[in-house]
Amino acid sequence: MIIGVPKEIKNNENRVGMTPAGVQEMTKRGHTVYVQATAGVNSGFSDDAYIAAGAKILPTIEDVYAIAEMIVKVKEPIASEYPLVREGQLVFTYFHFASSEPLTKAMVKSGAVCCAYETVERKDRSLPLLVPMSEVAGRMAVQEGCYFLERPRGGKGKLMGGVPGVKPAKVFVIGAGVVGTAAARTAAGMGADVTICDISLPRLTYLADVMPRNVKTLMSSEYNIREELKTADLVIGSVLIPGAKAPKLVTRDMLSLMEQGSVLVDVAIDQGGCFETSRPTTHEEPTYYVDGILHYCVANIPGAVPYTSTLALTNATLPYALQLVDKGWRKACADNEELRKGLNVVEGNVVYREVAEAWGLPYGPLVL
């Protein structure tokens, strides 16, 4: 198979879809890999490293899309890429269709086969291709939140861990999945007073056993969220419904409960966000205010640490990518239920129910 690895062009997206090690695995199996020039530079991989691994370098993104049977990316195609995706082409990347109607309709129109990292799902309902980036995003959410709590950055000027005689900052984490757990553990390690909430009592019971003493668990409800917002300095939203829009758990009227200069970090923004006042931002312009509350809603948080993120992501994606190229997408997805759940849009049809429901599009069950 001919595989293409384009350079990511989303704002400040510095990751790359395949490392030289991945290229080597592909080429030794007889596949051909084309990498766009400088695609891996920001992740620490030179064009020469790709060439040494067996890749061929192409100068433009148009060249890569035109020749490849399969595209391996990190983030969803942006508007300028829509015309490049063609009928029958397999695109393996994060899509987050439920957050973008234009993207969904463009991929339906293209006739491509869209296999989304975020909906590849194991029998235990874990999401193996989302976990590594969720680990990064959870840690980064606290790191960025801490930075923007500083007064010169627009926050209220609180130190996360406090000092002797001065209370630490209060961090409220909504959602106790991979992102939330990583965020709570990171904030606790910095000495903050942390509360994490979720709708799953078994999950909270588990966290109560394994988390540091400065992490408290709380059952998620509108009442409890409102109460926590009254004293929270940093709120991290990390709610996920696989493939679907995130629920809006913090409404605009709730912002009036918070102190001015408090910070909201919405890690769920790539699924539409879990705060009513959230809208996607970029690493160049990451924040904005609503009613005196600082919002950080960058949709590609891990893109700021591309070396770590690229290695973590490709460690997880490569085994699945190898199945797709060795067997072809139909047989690979027929043989592997985990991969099959990654199919969202196939040859003009939406085959993932939550995506169809998000935009009122016809849903067609997958036929392999």
Where are these regions (language model features)?
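An N-terminal-biased, well-structured beta-alpha scaffold segment characteristic
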Residues: 2-106, 110
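Rossmann-like adenosine-cofactor binding region
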Residues: 209-291
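Adenosine-phosphate binding glycine-rich loop
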Residues: 118-144, 148-159, 269, 274-368
